[in-house]
Amino acid sequence: MPMVKMVARGDTTMVAAYLTPHIRQYLDSFRSGFSDGLKQSKLFFMQSDGGLTAADHFQGSNAILSGPAGGVVGYALTTDLGKPVIGFDMGGTSTDVSRYGGDWEHTHESETAGVRIQAPQLDIRTVAAGGGSRLFFRQGRFEVGPESAGAHPGPVCYRKHGHLAVTDANLVLGRLHPDYFPQIFGPHENEPLDLVGSRTALQSLTDQINHEAASAGQPSRTVEEVALGFLRVANETMIRPIREVSVQRGFDIQEHVLACFGGAGGQHACALARDLGISLVFVHRFAGILSAYGIGLADLTTERQEPAAEVLAQVGDLSPTLPSNLAERLAELADQAASELQEQGASSSTLQVQLFLNLRYQGTDTNLMIREPEDGNYAQSFRQTYLREFGFELEREILVDDLRVRVVSPSPSLQKFKLPLA
């Protein structure tokens, strides 16, 4: 997808060239497992931007965040209160945080493993804090992660000679109940979670902490106080990206709903909501598989983008009109994108076209992707967004760096149903 910044485009091309052949190999293997090779069936894959695409159009550069993107779609479409939502997806090794305020929030340049990727992705922030994050006491400080106990050997409670982890702290504090877990732990995978083992390991660490505290003339702590201390450190680590996607972008966090999912999300959601001042928490009934559920709800989408390098508004021009050449180019991109979706089986009558301009002030390097506003005044929408995120405006020309079109073929709407009372 051509955009300004050649080096980032080169990195993106490299990622696509490296990953796409592996994806093609997987697709061939997957299809070969069916008697007809899925020739009579439609096969779609989730992309990092939150939309589906036909298998033959799936590219490596659009696959990096496809799993977490499914989770964003899942909570966004099932948490319908007319209020903005913070998504909190806590798993075993990491936590993914995002925000949904009625429109998908995308980023168009990111870095993964030191490689810049210039492709539309849902704005998902990841931190190394999860149920398997290890607990350390170093130089008088409680530390959580970034090292993970993993699935094997896992936390101490897995009975595989593992490491103290967040899961052990939750178990000791009674936030996890062994009776509600299957007996799949231990070397023969036939034993329950080991509460005694977790408490013994945490007691050993508590003794070390109290020994250092006594040397410094500080009071001792109980096992429960130490466990809670580690959880507070983990919670603060996870709160940081939540503030990044909300407060640091000019949004009032207290006006949001917290939607938690993932295998460990429910253990920490209330504590995070309390610290953030959020009064309503959603825990989906499919919390452990919400990313997969969201993929089933996602729309079929495609995008087109190209550089522009045009002036949109002069200094002091509050209501500039979109130059006719840019409007024509946007229409051409929309036609190309619509044709691709129709080739994938979408009906032309259902397609929704979304237009965007990638704008910045003259002399700056801070771009904002602005969706076409109802009144068509891109410049004013850009100024308002810039003011909300950065707290000031500039008396400078507004430049168009890129044109972007997103065409969507909506999936069937969710059918609401009542659950029987417990």
Language-model regions, residue ranges each:
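Gly/Ser/Thr-rich active-site cleft segment
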Residues: 1-68, 154-207
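Conserved phosphate-binding catalytic cores of ATP/NTP-utilizing and phosphoryl-transfer enzymes
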Residues: 6-16, 28-31, 50-85, 107-122, ...
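Glycine/threonine-rich beta-strand-loop-alpha-helix active-site module
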Residues: 86-87, 94-144, 153-155, 283-294
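Structural motif
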Residues: 42-44, 62-63, 70, 84-86, ...
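Short acidic-glycine loop/turn motifs at beta-strand connectors
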Residues: 36, 48, 100-103, 136-141, ...
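C-terminal, non-catalytic interaction/recognition modules in large multi-subunit enzymes and RNPs
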Residues: 84, 92, 145, 149-152, ...
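Active-site nucleophile and cofactor-binding loops and adjacent substrate-binding regions
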Residues: 1, 47, 61-69, 89, ...
